[in-house]
């Protein structure tokens, strides 16, 4: 993470980290496979290499650095190498080095390594216009997880700022009497440590209503619960100085609309909310700035993100339909700006992998995607022309991806031409297979079964399995098909792979980790497939471990 941040854009890398964490680790924490970063026990060591151990584990080190500061962290790393190089070091050995370098007791922080689950941090705010104060009530809660019904409060570093109604950042002046000396020093650098279940803070000398800019830089792996108005989110999307908060404001606004649409698809659309959201995006696009960041702002939350937000009784078809409609809304509302971006960002210069060039390509391809979502008849020729004339694989794959989201003849022509051109390149054919497996349309499962019978596919090739079958398992709409065909297909593949490659079989089986979130019919169908797998006497220890925990 840090290497890429230093070499490319720190903001874009951080957003990518957060997307990965939420998609993989938050989902793991919310299901039957939840476990701590350092589990007390395990049944199969091959199942130890999880998003929790790796992705959440990285976030703990990031939090540690934030809590003790860069200098103390650097000294602690050096001390760790001096003390522990060549030894079987433990988490306790690791943390002891940072206690020595910082003078801080990290026993409470160590609970992050022991306790499973994603904490929720709630911020309740009250502004007193007469007193010119803002009162914040902070609270944290971690839900029960398998084997850990009771949770303790954690040390949560909450990076925070205040934004005025004009979009300017305001100084943090708090009632310092409520803090000890260490906490007052942390507040000066925009940090509040939430170490108990609740904490009350009052900011003073605020002559205007403010917007709270919380969890800057995604300072902790938590779910933030905050009752921001649409107006507040629009302000943050346009003016917040922290890129993560700006991006999160757009994500939160879109999520609000998408969750409402998925929960009550027949109740009508929130036209005023959609108009306000698209206007906020228009202002962000018109402001210019880093093209790569603008591309992130324009990318809606994924179907997995929306399902996780809904939490239970999830209907993947309703989520897909709502997301497609909102993508089309954004494309129509911003069609003039998007078409201008698409044309202005075209380049005849030789391909360069530098960050600036990559950002321009990302924004141009995002514009193409939204334009095609809004008007398939107009966007498809643009995508086909880009596919034909692209000077680099990024642009050609982006155009093919857009075409694969349509059901046009141009899609099939482009797929055939792509295959003929790159049939001898294994890595590119992996991508070709994956694109087809992730098509959201009916008939995708039949297409995948057909591709499995071609010479390009072999169950003995893990990369091919990950690309085609793993791609389908990640296809939220088709894997969760209401007739259970997606569950049956992946379950059959798990059983076929298990005797030969249980590690890959387990990765496919992880697609079932959120089965309890589905609406009742899908729940029953997914459970039936899991119990069928569980009933096979010859299962490997790897698959047996995951299926037993999934059904526990």
PLM regions with names:
Residues 59, 94, 119-125, 132-134, ...:
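Structural beta-strand/beta-sheet cores of well-ordered domains, especially the beta-sheet scaffolds
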Residues 4-14, 71-76, 104-111, 120-122, ...:
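Acidic/polar loop patches that form or flank catalytic/metal-binding clefts of enzymes
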Residues 105-108, 116-214, 327, 331, ...:
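Beta-strand-rich binding/interaction modules
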Residues 71, 177-180, 247-254:
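K/E-rich alpha-helical interaction surfaces of small helical-bundle regulatory domains
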Residues 23, 50, 202-552:
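Long, ordered, helix-rich scaffold segments
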Residues 14-15, 112, 156, 432, ...:
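Tryptophan-centered motif/residue detector
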């Amino acid at each position: 993470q840090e290497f890429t941040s230093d070499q490319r854009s720190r903001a874009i890398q951080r957003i990518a980290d957060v997307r990965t964490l939420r998609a993989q680790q938050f989902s793991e924490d919310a299901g039957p496979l939840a476990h701590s970063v350092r589990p007390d026990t395990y049944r199969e060591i091959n199942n130890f290499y999880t998003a929790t151990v790796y992705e959440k584990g990285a976030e703990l080190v990031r939090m540690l650095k934030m809590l003790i500061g860069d200098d103390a962290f650097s000294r602690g790393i050096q001390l760790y190498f001096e003390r522990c190089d060549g030894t079987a070091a433990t988490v306790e050995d690791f943390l002891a080095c940072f206690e020595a370098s910082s003078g801080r007791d990290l026993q409470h922080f160590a609970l992050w390594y022991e306790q499973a689950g994603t904490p929720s941090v709630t911020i309740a705010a009250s502004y007193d216009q007469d007193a010119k104060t803002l009162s914040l009530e902070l609270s944290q809660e971690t839900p029960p997880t398998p084997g850990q019904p009771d949770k303790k409060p954690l040390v949560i570093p909450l990076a925070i700022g205040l934004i005025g109604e004009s979009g300017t950042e305001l100084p943090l002046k708090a009632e310092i009497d409520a803090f000890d000396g260490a906490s007052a020093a942390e507040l000066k650098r925009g940090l509040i440590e939430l170490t108990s279940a609740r904490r009350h803070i009052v900011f003073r000398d605020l002559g205007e209503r403010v917007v709270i800019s919380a969890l800057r830089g995604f300072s902790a792996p938590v779910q933030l619960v905050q009752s921001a108005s649409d107006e507040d989110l629009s302000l943050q999307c346009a003016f917040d100085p922290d890129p993560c908060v700006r991006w999160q404001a757009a994500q939160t606004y879109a999520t609000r609309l998408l969750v409402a649409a998925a929960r009550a698809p027949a109740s009508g659309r929130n036209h005023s909310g959609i108009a306000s959201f698209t206007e906020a995006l228009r202002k962000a696009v018109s402001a210019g700035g880093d093209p790569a960041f603008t591309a992130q702002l324009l990318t809606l939350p994924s179907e997995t993100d929306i399902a996780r937000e809904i939490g239970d009784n999830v209907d993947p078809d309703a989520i897909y339909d709502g997301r497609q409609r909102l993508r089309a809304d954004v494309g129509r509302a911003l069609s003039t700006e998007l078409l201008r971006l698409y044309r202005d960002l075209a380049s005849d210069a030789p391909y360069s992998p530098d960050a600036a060039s990559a950002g321009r390509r990302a924004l141009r391809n995002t514009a193409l995607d939204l334009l095609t979502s809004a008007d398939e008849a107009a966007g498809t020729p643009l995508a086909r022309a880009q596919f034909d004339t692209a000077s680099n694989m990024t642009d050609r794959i982006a155009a093919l991806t857009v075409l694969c989201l349509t059901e046009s003849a141009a899609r099939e022509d482009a797929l055939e031409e792509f295959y003929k051109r790159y049939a001898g390149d294994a890595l590119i054919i992996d991508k070709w297979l994956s694109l087809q497996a992730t098509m959201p349309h009916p008939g995708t499962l039949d297409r995948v079964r057909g591709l499995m019978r071609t010479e390009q596919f072999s169950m003995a090739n893990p990369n091919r399995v990950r690309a085609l079958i793993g791609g389908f398992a990640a296809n939220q709409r088709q894997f969760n098909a209401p007739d259970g065909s997606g569950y049956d297909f992946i379950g059959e593949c798990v059983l076929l792979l298990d005797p030969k490659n249980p590690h890959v079989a387990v990765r496919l089986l992880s697609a079932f980790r959120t089965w309890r979130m589905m609406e009742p019919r899908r729940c029953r169908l997914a459970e039936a497939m899991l119990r069928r797998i569980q009933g096979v006497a010859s299962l490997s220890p790897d698959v047996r471990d995951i299926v037993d925990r999934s059904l526990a």
